[in-house]
């Protein structure tokens, strides 16, 4: 079947939406936003040489070739997928080089300004190669679809894979992204490198983060100050479990200046939703309503009340009933109680 995405026309055996499959020429329709953002950021970063490390159908690398000024290399280990990618490169008359080899080999033999890590499942096996081989001041785009691991749903697996302890609660997706970035940062520090998060999203079944990579002991030492543990019982409200979670990334998830530069209408809704996600955690109205046996009021009304009390209040991408605010949890609870009495 033939798919049109962005400027590319792709021939694929099948189109699929969901966590992913191990099949030749795999095309995931749920990842269109992921690829749109990748195009936008590569254009903003101004990089010259790009590695699409997991070719699949070739759609990402072909779109980068057609929609940016970067030179593109597509790596793919599957012979069947390589044949599909060759066909799609020809269909689009794209200037993309296809290499039939695994990610680690290709990334270690050619210097790249941007490396895209979008594997089936966890990115963990590929992070060291990406961090070590991207050029100084270069960028990584990393996708993780192992959400159950990153959100603490499988505690032992979370410990094994990411060396972290996470409680699977209303904060699971923010904590999942902070766990992922924290792990990337720790791996970077092991090689005297450091990262600066540029953009981070949760979308459906995957997390996607973009980071800038620098080199140097001083930068690495400064970066690790942003990795640590948090206790929701002491930092949010005593109704939460009294445990230390982490290690996680405690600093910004997004580069605010970069977000302001992205004007693509295809991604504008998501960009607007993540603009205030740098603040650590949030207050969730569903959580408060459940604990206080109150009906859930309109989110906008509660945000207005919070701002009338002199605090900031913004939507968050991590929960449809979450508010990023500097208003204490207990005070938001009192605002809900007062609203319920009207």
UniProtKB/Swiss-Prot annotation:
It catalyses: guanosine(26) in tRNA + 2 S-adenosyl-L-methionine = N(2)-dimethylguanosine(26) in tRNA + 2 S-adenosyl-L-homocysteine + 2 H(+). InterPro entries: SAM-dependent_MTases_sf (IPR029063), Trm1 (IPR002905), TRM1_arc_bac (IPR022923), tRNA_met_Trm1_C (IPR042296). PROSITE patterns: SAM_MT_TRM1. Its EC number is 2.1.1.216. The keyword S-adenosyl-L-methionine applies. Keywords: Methyltransferase, RNA-binding, S-adenosyl-L-methionine, Transferase, tRNA processing, tRNA-binding. GO terms for biological process: tRNA N2-guanine methylation. It comes from the Archaea. S-adenosyl-L-methionine binds at residues 35, 60, 76. Gene3D superfamilies: N2,N2-dimethylguanosine tRNA methyltransferase, C-terminal domain, Vaccinia Virus protein VP39. Coiled coil: none annotated. Transmembrane segments: none annotated. Pfam families: TRM. Residues 1-336 form the Trm1 methyltransferase domain. It is an enzyme of class 2 (transferase). GO terms for molecular function: tRNA (guanine(26)-N2)-dimethyltransferase activity; tRNA binding. Belongs to the class I-like SAM-binding methyltransferase superfamily. Trm1 family. Dimethylates a single guanine residue at position 26 of a number of tRNAs using S-adenosyl-L-methionine as donor of the methyl groups. This is tRNA (guanine(26)-N(2))-dimethyltransferase. The gene is trm1.
């Amino acid at each position: 079947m033939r798919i049109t995405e962005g400027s590319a026309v792709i021939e694929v055996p099948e189109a699929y939406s969901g966590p992913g499959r191990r099949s030749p020429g795999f095309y995931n329709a749920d990842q269109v936003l992921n690829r749109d953002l990748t195009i936008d950021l590569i254009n903003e970063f101004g990089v010259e040489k790009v590695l699409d490390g997991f070719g699949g159908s070739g759609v990402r690398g072909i779109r980068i070739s057609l929609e940016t000024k970067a030179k593109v290399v597509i790596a793919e280990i599957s012979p069947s997928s390589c044949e599909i990618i060759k066909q799609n490169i020809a269909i689009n008359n794209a200037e993309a080089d296809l290499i039939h080899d695994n990610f680690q080999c290709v990334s270690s033999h050619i210097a790249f300004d941007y490396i895209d890590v979008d594997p089936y499942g966890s990115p963990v096996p590929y992070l060291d190669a990406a961090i070590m081989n991207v050029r100084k001041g270069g960028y990584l785009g990393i996708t993780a679809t192992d959400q159950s691991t990153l959100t603490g749903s499988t505690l032992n697996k979370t410990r094994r894979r990411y060396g972290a302890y996470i409680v699977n609660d209303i904060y699971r997706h923010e904590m999942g992204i902070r766990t992922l970035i924290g792990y990337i940062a720790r791996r970077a520090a092991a090689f005297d490198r450091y990262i600066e998060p540029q953009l981070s999203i949760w979308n459906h079944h995957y997390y996607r983060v973009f980071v800038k990579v620098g080199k140097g002991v001083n930068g690495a030492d400064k970066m690790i100050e942003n990795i640590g543990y948090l206790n929701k019982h002491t930092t949010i409200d005593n109704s939460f479990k009294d445990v230390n979670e982490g290690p996680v990334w405690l600093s910004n998830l997004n580069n605010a200046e970069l977000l302001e530069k992205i004007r693509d209408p295809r991604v504008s809704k998501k960009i607007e939703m993540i603009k205030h996600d740098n603040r650590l955690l949030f207050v969730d109205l569903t959580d408060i309503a459940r604990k206080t046996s109150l009906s859930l009021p309109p989110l906008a009304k509660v945000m207005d009340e919070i701002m009338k009390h002199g605090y900031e209040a913004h939507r968050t991408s991590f929960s449809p009933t979450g508010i990023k605010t500097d208003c204490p949890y207990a005070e938001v609870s009192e605002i809900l109680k007062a609203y319920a009495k009207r």
